[in-house]
Every structure is written in C-alpha cells, then in structure tokens.
A protein has these predicted regions:
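Bacterial N-terminal signal peptides that target proteins for export
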Residues: 3-14
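C-terminal cap/substrate-recognition subdomain and adjoining C-terminal extension
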Residues: 29-47, 51, 57-60, 65, ...
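Non-catalytic pre-domain segments flanking phosphatase-related domains
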Residues: 12-17, 25-72, 80-124, 424-428
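Active-site-adjacent helix/loop patches that line small-molecule binding or acyl-intermediate pockets
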Residues: 130, 134, 138-151, 181-205, ...
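Conserved phosphoryl-transfer catalytic core
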Residues: 86-179
Length: 429
C-alpha cells in the first residue's frame, strides 16, 4: 500500500517538478544569454536587463529602439588590437612612408620637453623627442634604403633586415617612444600619435594588415617580453631597454554572445573606441571573430586622408574618441539620431569613465575589473555596494589575465599572479 501511495505521489509531483525545472532553466537563460564565465550577479542583471528592454519586454518601443555602447580594447577583447597592430607593423616593417614623412609622423604634436623620469635611458639620462627622433630617423632611413619591401631599391629580405643592428634599434626605440609619450603627455597628444604611423596607407590596406595582426596575435601565447636597442650603433638617445610589452590577443565569448543577443532582441549595438575606427572595424565586424558589429556602428579615432591615403594629421572635423570625447562622439552621432542616450555602457578604463556616467538614460554600466585606482576603478566600489540588487546600475566583471578570459566572479587575477583581487589596494581602506 505504501508503495502504491508513493507511486501516486510521484506521478502527481514529478510533472510539477519538471515544470519548475523548466521555469528555472528559462529564468537562468531566458533570452539566449550564455552564462559562460560571467560573475553570477552580473549575468543575472544583464539577463534581466535584456528581458526588460529587448523586444517583447515591457520597456521596448520599436519606434524608439534602445541602444548600447561598448568600448573595444580590454572590454570586448583581451588586450589591445591597435597596440598589437603597432608592434606587428614594426616586426614586419609594414610602413608606407618615405623617411621624410616618417620623421614628420613621429614628431607630430610631441613637445620637445624631456620625457618623464620613468623613461630615462639605461644610463639614467633623460630623453626627449629630438634625441630619440634622430636615432629613429637614422634607423628607418637605413631600412628604407635596404629592405626590399619598401620598394626603394633595397635588396635585403625581411629576415636579413631584421638581423641588422638598425632594425634592433628601430624596433626597441619606436616601441619605447610610444610608451614614453603615453606616460609623459596628455591623452590628446598620445592617443593620436600612434595613428600617424599609418600614413601612406589606404583604409583597405590598414584593414588587411589589421586582420593579419589579429590572427597572428590570437595564435600567440599570452606573455610579456622585453625589447632592447642596439649596443653597437652610435646614438643620441643612448641604450634603451624596456620590459612589460604584452603579446597576444583573445576574443571574449561572453561579450560576443551578449552583443548578438542584444541585437536579436532589437537593441542596437555600437562600439566607441580610442583606437582607429578602421582597425576596430576589422575585429568587430568580420564574422570569423564572432562579434558581428556593422562597420558603420563603430565610432573611433580618425586620421586625415589625402588622395585616399592617410596623412600624419588628425581629422579636424571629428572629435578624439577618448575620455570626454567619447561622450561628445555619442552625442554627435547617436543622441542626434535617436534623441536619447544609451541604456547601457560597457568599459574597462578611465578613458571610458565619462561615457559611463554622462547619460541619464543609462540603466546599466558594466565595469570590466582591471583593478584600476582612478575614477573608473571607483565605479567598481559602487557596483559592490549594490551587488545582487535587481536594479543595480553598476555591475562588475572579473577576469584572469593569465589566460585572457573572464572568470565567474567579480575579482580579477592580474597577469603573473595567482590570487584574485576585488579592488586596487589604494581603494581598500
């Protein structure tokens, strides 16, 4: 009798349990958003956000479609696509400038002041653009005349050119110069500078090179490395050696899935980047990378063009899409189009801070946790104050920099470390 009762009980209860499980599964991934390695609270907030604001949701109005804005480097991907391309150009000597144009490009808008004390040469002497510029001029001129790829009559193969002391000096000092400019001068000087090295190239040439660089970097091991200049060449700047250069890129499947889910629910997806627009368009648009962002939906830095080729001058009709310039670009291109601001913004750095806080319509701000100590890093503090709340505006996502991937937690493991951290030490009191 007891067995029969149990069987009857199971027959009644099992269907109810099955329904409950199905409802639970639906609530966990109701809109196709893959839990992946999202921090659970971050995932739940994003899923609820899409449900409420996407097509079929209570807040959705097809006459006023919502839109979101993502930063690109270190947000949608791991590491920086433009920095990877910069060093790929150096390694493969992919430049389209005469020595005269190169000399103009590396000096464009750079003050003659000494670089900060963090960027002295190996002998502890200060360096400035005049000193290192002279060394780079000499090295580039040698390579331009001797490497066959420049088409100036040289006979050296790439392998032969790379074996020269001039290439060793060129590689180390141009990479170092990028770091020294960024570490010494303001963002409006440093951000455009690297773009001027595309001078002489067409947009299509830049895109083709960016794709090659992406593919090479995606296959690379994630590591840091050191570059040192020639010890035998006579030079103005002296011997320079610097470590900490980052090798390798990684896609972030959680971000590509999120972008695709947003679009499938009628939420328009945009990217606002401080990299060159055409460089990011390659990574964000080509189907093989998985993000599928329309090219016209990428707002980025722009370099002036003459006769269809880039020249060493910023496009003075366009804003610099970094810091407050990101907000201005969104207002110019998107608020003017839609009549309202983005309902969500995604970023990782101080360069994204303004666009994360400047729009009253923004419901969600995703903070990729890089353990920053600036105003952007403080958004992570706000995220943890409202952690798990259904209406949280700021949400935090951790990652493991050793493998270039999200981790299912708000804490981040820095490269070379094993212990996860929630905030930069300076923010913890």
């Amino acid at each position: 009798m007891k067995k029969v009762t149990n069987n009857r009980y199971l027959k009644c209860v099992l269907p109810l349990l099955l329904v409950a499980l199905l409802v639970s599964a639906a609530s966990a991934a109701p809109i196709g958003l893959d839990p992946g390695k999202w921090a659970p609270a971050t995932y739940q907030r994003l899923a609820a956000f899409v449900e409420a604001n996407g097509s079929g949701g209570p807040n959705y109005d097809p006459a006023k479609p919502p839109y979101v804005v993502f930063d690109w480097d270190q947000t949608c991907i791991f590491n920086d696509t433009e920095e990877a391309l910069f060093r790929y150009k150096i390694e493969t000597l992919n430049f389209k400038m005469t020595p005269e144009v190169f000399a103009e490009a590396i000096r464009k808008d750079i003050p003659k002041d000494n670089f900060s004390d963090d960027y002295k040469n190996a002998d502890g002497k200060t360096v400035n653009i005049d000193l290192i510029g002279a060394d780079l001029d000499a090295a580039y001129t040698f390579l331009y005349k001797n490497y066959e790829g420049f088409g100036a009559g040289g006979k050296m193969t790439l392998a032969e050119a790379r074996a020269t002391e001039e290439f060793i000096d060129f590689r180390a000092k141009l990479a170092w110069l990028y770091e020294a400019i960024g570490g010494t001068f303001s963002a409006d000087v440093s951000y455009p500078w690297v773009l001027y090295l595309f001078s002489g190239m067409t947009a299509d040439e830049v895109k083709a090179l960016a794709e090659k660089s992406n593919d090479a970097a995606l296959a690379d091991k994630l590591e840091t490395y050191t570059l040192s200049s020639s010890k035998t060449l006579q030079s103005k700047a002296g011997y320079i050696s610097m470590g900490g250069y980052k090798r390798g890129l990684r896609t972030v499947p959680e971000m590509s899935n999120l972008m695709n889910v947003l679009r499938s629910h009628g939420i328009h997806v945009y990217v606002c980047t401080a990299s060159l627009d055409n460089v990011v368009r390659v990574f964000s648009n080509l189907p093989k990378y998985g993000y599928n962002v329309p090219e016209e939906n990428v707002l980025g830095m722009r370099v002036a063009m003459e006769d269809g080729k880039y020249v060493p001058r910023y496009d003075d009709t366009w804003v610099q899409t970094q810091q407050a310039g990101k907000t201005e670009a969104i207002k110019r291109e998107l608020v003017s189009k839609y009549g309202y601001g983005p309902i969500a913004v995604f970023g990782d750095s101080q360069g994204d801070y303004r666009m994360c806080v400047d729009f009253e319509e923004t419901q969600v701000v995703l903070v990729v946790n890089r353990l920053r100590k600036d105003d952007f890093g403080k958004l992570g503090l706000q995220a943890m104050e409202t952690h798990g709340k259904p209406d949280a505006k700021f949400i935090l996502q951790g990652r493991d920099e050793n493998i270039g991937a999200f981790r299912p937690d708000e804490k981040t493991i820095k490269y070379g470390k094993t212990e996860p951290e929630l905030f930069h030490a300076s923010l913890v009191k």
